[in-house]
Regions:
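Conserved class I S-adenosyl-L-methionine
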Residues: 2-56
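A short acidic, Gly/Pro-enriched loop at the edge of an enzyme's catalytic core
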Residues: 104-111
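A short glycine-rich, Lys/Arg-flanked "PGG" loop and its adjoining helix->strand segment in the class I
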Residues: 129-141
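C-terminal lobe and adjacent flexible extensions of AdoMet/dcAdoMet transferase-like proteins
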Residues: 210-257
Length: 257
C-alpha cells in the first residue's frame, strides 16, 4: 500500500477537490443527513461555543452557526477554507489554518467535534492520540468531544483479497483497499457523468476500532459518555456500520498532555 505514504493531505484537498466537494441537497449534504447532525451538535453545545476540527467548506459549521452556536474552525486546506468564505466571512466563522492534531484556536469551548470519519485522515496512531489531546486542551471543564466514524468494514473483505465495494449507486462507486498490517485503507470514489466519463478521488485513512478510540480518549483524560449508531440516537450494535461517540472531560480534570 505504498499509495498511502505517497498521498499528502495538502495535495489531496487541493483547489480542484475543494471546488467539487459540495453536493447541495445530495449525499452528505442531504437534509436527512445534515439535519440530525446539526440538531445533535446544537444540543451538545448548549449556550457554549463550538470548535470544528477539519471544518472544510463548512458543511456542518454554517448551518450550526445559523442556529446561533458560535463556531470556530481548524482546517489544513486553504482551498477548502476559500470555498467556506464564499458562504460566510471570517467574522461569522473564524478559521485557523493548521493541523487538527496540533493547531490552536483562541478561547475555550463547550464542544469540539470531528465528523464524517475525518479523524482517520491522520495516518498514524500517534497523530490520532494527539488529536484527542488537542481537543482536550480546547475544552472547558465538562466539555465534550464528538467523533463520527465508520466501523472498519473488514467483515466484508473476502479472504485473501484487499478490496471491497462499500457503496454502489447510479453514477457512483465507493471502493476501499486495505493494508491490514498498518491499519490503513484507501477510499476510492468513482463518479460518472452522463457521458460515462469517470472522475476518481482517492483518500488515505488509518481505520480505528471503537475500543482503540476509547483508549485514545482515556489517554487524553476523557470518559466515554455515549455511543450511538447515528445522529438520531439509534442503538449501537455489532451490526452498526458507523458510530457517533461523545467523550466528556469530567469537571475538575485537566487534559493529559
Amino acid at each position: 500500500m505504498a499509495i498511502v505514504g505517497s498521498m499528502r493531505q495538502e495535495e489531496i484537498w487541493n483547489t480542484e477537490t475543494a471546488q467539487n466537494y459540495d453536493t447541495p441537497g445530495a449525499g452528505m449534504f442531504a437534509p436527512e443527513v445534515l439535519g440530525p447532525t446539526v440538531d445533535r451538535l446544537a444540543e451538545l453545545a448548549g449556550d457554549g461555543r463550538a470548535l470544528e476540527f477539519a471544518i472544510g467548506t463548512g458543511r456542518v459549521a454554517v448551518p450550526l452557526a445559523e442556529r446561533g452556536v458560535p463556531v470556530t474552525g481548524i482546517e489544513l486546506s486553504r482551498p477548502m477554507v476559500e470555498q467556506l468564505r464564499t458562504k460566510v466571512d471570517e467574522a461569522t466563522i473564524p478559521v485557523v489554518i493548521g493541523d487538527m492534531a496540533s493547531a490552536t484556536a483562541p478561547g475555550e469551548y463547550a464542544l469540539v467535534y470531528l465528523v464524517y470519519n475525518t479523524i482517520s485522515n491522520l495516518l498514524t496512531q500517534a497523530e490520532q492520540v494527539a488529536c484527542f489531546r488537542n481537543a482536550a486542551r480546547h475544552l472547558a471543564p465538562g466539555g465534550r468531544f464528538v467523533i463520527e466514524l465508520r466501523v472498519p468494514g473488514l467483515r466484508k473483505l473476502p479472504p485473501g483479497q484487499e478490496a471491497v465495494v462499500w457503496h454502489q449507486e447510479p453514477g457512483y462507486i465507493g471502493l476501499d483497499t486495505y493494508d491490514l498490517l498498518r491499519q490503513h485503507v484507501v477510499s476510492h470514489h468513482l463518479r460518472f457523468d452522463e457521458s460515462g466519463q469517470a472522475r476518481l478521488f482517492r483518500s488515505p485513512h488509518r481505520y480505528i476500532w471503537p475500543a482503540e478510540l476509547d483508549l485514545m480518549g482515556r489517554l487524553a483524560g476523557f470518559e466515554l459518555e455515549s455511543r450511538h449508531a447515528d445522529w438520531i440516537g439509534t442503538e449501537f450494535t455489532a451490526e452498526s456500520r458507523s458510530h457517533v461517540s461523545v467523550y466528556r472531560m469530567p469537571p475538575g480534570r485537566t487534559s493529559s498532555r
